[in-house]
Amino acid sequence: MEAILMIGVITLCVIFLLSGRNNKKKQEIRELEDYLEDLNQRIVQRTQILSELNEVITNRSVDKSVNMSACEIAVLDLYEQSNIRIPSDIIEDMVNQRLQSEQDVLNYIETQRTYWKLENQKKLYRGSLK
């Protein structure tokens, strides 16, 4: 009877120790999974930052023959395809602005075109000539 009781107690101790080890291993596995998930999120963030930086580098690259960035050339090509002439003053000012994206370049050109259109519609008052 005592032998059976001892075997039962030893069996319970072994089961308790094994379950404790399993819980410890499960906790370590959970911690490692959390760490891997954090690393994956960091990789995704770094990849996004890298793609944004590559886009900025591409937009800032300057064509030495015309001294304009790739985005400026692309927008001017759009105007050329649409048979819209851009005054050289606007182009010179645009090059000096060093705009970063195609949308910025497009907005700048359209703003300048509107300004120059209004400026060129002004007329001299008749009373000013005597």
Curated annotation (Swiss-Prot):
Membrane topology of this protein: Single-pass membrane protein
Coiled-coil region list: 17-56
GO MF annotation: an example: DNA binding
Region (DNA-binding): 70-130
Subcellular location: Host cell membrane
Site label Involved in oligomerization and DNA binding, positions: N120
Site (Involved in dimerization) residue list: R113, W116
A single cellular component GO annotation: host cell plasma membrane
Keywords, sorted A to Z: Coiled coil, DNA replication, DNA-binding, Early protein, Host cell membrane, Host membrane, Membrane, Transmembrane, Transmembrane helix, Viral DNA replication
InterPro entries (UniProt xref): Phage_DNA_replic_GP16.7, Phage_DNA_replic_GP16.7_sf
Residues passing through the membrane, by range: 1-20
GO biological process: DNA replication; viral DNA genome replication
Protein family: Belongs to the phi29likevirus gp16.7 family.
Function: Binds to the long stretches of ssDNA of the viral DNA replication intermediates created during the protein-primed mechanism of replication of the viral genome and attaches the viral DNA to the membrane of the infected cells. Required for the redistribution of replicating viral DNA from the initial replication site to membrane-associated sites surrounding the nucleoid. Required for the second pull step of DNA ejection.
Subunit description: Homodimer; homooligomer. Interacts with DNA; one dsDNA binding subunit is constituted by three p16.7 dimers.
Protein name: DNA replication protein 16.7
The encoding gene: 16.7
